[in-house]
Amino acid sequence: MPEGHTVHRLAAAFDRAFAGQRVRTSSPQGRFSEAAQLDGMVLLGAEAVGKHLFLPFAPAADVDPGAPVVRHVHIHLGLYGSWTFAGDPGFADAHAIGAPRLRMGEREEELDGAADWRRLVPRPTVRLRIAGAHGLADLTGPTACEILDAQGRQAVLDRLGPDPLRPDPGGRERRRFVEAVRRSRTTIGALLMNQKVVAGIGNIYRA
């Protein structure tokens, strides 16, 4: 399962690839028909919190991400989910592995540099396709892929502990983690795996 650092890397790739662009969205698999609600909207950016990815969509690029009109696509890759990017040279990641295509998940694979991403037919397993001016991203096999309003997004965040990769200028989140550990009699290894205590850590960093 991709851990927090991978999801943060994924969010950064989305920012570079799509932030501020009006995009096309579809669900070739048909299991995320809500994609039609987002088609033609602007993808404001991307946010990673622990193992969760949030993609805020709005009618225009100048809409505040916290505005009521914003719809947040919430994605958790789980054990089998992955994103595949394809596009113009340098798309999504200036240091992309196997550019111009990289898979952000458990696996990474290469696309023939001569191939035209605009002609790529989505696999039947693609839950969500996002296409912009210079490339596209295909999502397959996620545990969660849903549209949330601001309250729904906050409900997900309220279930999570601090994410050590997010800015914490006042140290509030660090103190929250320390207090949770001190209150518990559970072993530190088990606490690190508890997403309510600290978000994003999995077996790799626990080990």
Where do the language-model regions lie?
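Structured catalytic/nucleic-acid-binding cores of DNA maintenance enzymes
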Residues: 1-207
